[in-house]
Amino acid sequence: MTFEKTLVPNPRPAAHGCNACEIPDGRVWLMWYAGTREGVEDQRVLMSVRNADGNWSEPQVLVDHFQHSNDRWVPEIAAPLILENGEHWVVFSAAPLARFRFREERNLFLRDLEYARLFHAKIDPRTWSIGSPIELFDREALILQGKNVQLANGSWLVLCNSRDSQGRFSSTLVQGSPHDGWEQVCDLEAEPGCLEPSVAQLPDGRLLCYMRYAGYDGCIWRSESDNSPSDFSTPSQTTLRNPHSGIDIAADDEGRLFIAYNDSHRMRTPLTLGISVDGGRTFRCRDIETSNGEFSYPKLLQTSDGQWQVFYTHRRECIAHVSFDPLWILSGRPVFGQFPR
């Protein structure tokens, strides 16, 4: 197998912002938000499950609009979380309907993010019904983007953006669990902005954080920590191009660093997969999408059988799922990942 691509059914006109994980029975649980288009009040978080036969279940609503603080709230990006005891949870961001939409730009409705908050809710995997959403803590202007990451010590990281009153974006890391509570442990800042963090822990305990560049003609930001999410280094730019779009990283037991990103300064195509065997200094890369259109917000997943998958927005119409062979990526083109020191 080089790679195999499947388009996940989507019953709404538009789809974006997926996250996925493997559940205890070996199936893959995928979620994304969908509606008329991004930023319209009719969006909900949908989900589908990839069964043992490789087929995807009929999509269903996972997180609908809900009542909170005397308002109706609209959910956006959501990410699954499976606890050691088998409990299924979802973490998501949402904003009050009264302040959800504030302007239209390039066929998108941009949201008033300063009122967005983080929530979590328990899920019944027998019916995929959701419990009452609960705020993680009392803070506004937080938007979930990345997948939830379990660290070697068992705690979880929730990966978010925050934005100040001047509109500058930063990356915010939240640590904890649904039962033990959550706290903000790190806020990473760099001009003109770094957002949508993705974190991977290497076998030696080191943590790497790669982030979207808040603008065009920039490169992916990188920060690292010896072993604690509270002491990441000041972000610095890599040499990996970024068109103001989401990226994702992951690591395997061999210490290889995987990355999925758009290898462009301006376009959300091509969509590129890369593997580094030297901690991100160099990569071997291949493109899995090269045609016109948007192929964005990738999420990497290694399942318990050792197989690698990537999920991403496919032309804003649905979510694509690709299974790929790392050996195929490793035979690809060489790419520098960091400026020489």
Annotate each predicted stretch with a short phrase.
Residues 1-341:
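Asp-box/BNR beta-propeller blade signature and adjacent active/binding-site loops
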